[in-house]
């Protein structure tokens, strides 16, 4: 079974993330969406909230499993029995960092490849941080996220 891991903070999961996963399942038998703990960032949603939202958004895709993780990504990928790490590249500016990360991961685990997918055109400009900012200022995020995510964003903003 060919397995890939698609890691990210998914804070929150966007239509761009969702699109990449739905395209990836055409390439792999199974895709593990790995929701990162993200110690260096201060996530808007907790790990449990991000995992739950991501599971709900992708519930209709049987080849997808959503898991939270902390620690080294490449170790998590190996534990999943995956052959590849999937990364999305929205712009050339993403490439430099992703290229370095891919090189380090290859050095640590030479048998695991990194594959880059570009987003579908309508999602190239979407980022989770932009979505959060738009939502916090009362803007409409429904074109950019699943309705469940839009609802959770507004609930979370009201709580804070």
UniProtKB/Swiss-Prot annotation:
Can the keyword Oxidoreductase be found in this entry's annotation?
no
What GO terms in the biological process aspect are recorded for it?
coenzyme A biosynthetic process
Tell me what reaction this enzyme catalyses: (R)-4'-phosphopantetheine + ATP + H(+) = 3'-dephospho-CoA + diphosphate
Q: Where does ATP bind?
A: 9-10, 17, 88-90, 98, 123-129
SUPFAM superfamilies attached to this UniProt entry: Nucleotidylyl transferase
Has UniProt tagged this entry with the keyword Cytoplasm?
A: yes
Q: Name one GO molecular function term.
A: pantetheine-phosphate adenylyltransferase activity
CDD domains recorded = PPAT
| Subunit composition and interactions | Homohexamer.
Which PANTHER family does the entry link to? PHOSPHOPANTETHEINE ADENYLYLTRANSFERASE
Q: According to its UniProt entry, what is the function of this protein?
A: Reversibly transfers an adenylyl group from ATP to 4'-phosphopantetheine, yielding dephospho-CoA (dPCoA) and pyrophosphate.
Q: What is this protein called?
A: Phosphopantetheine adenylyltransferase
Protein species of origin: Thiobacillus denitrificans (strain ATCC 25259 / T1)
Instruction: Give the lineage.
Output: Bacteria, Pseudomonadati, Pseudomonadota, Betaproteobacteria, Nitrosomonadales
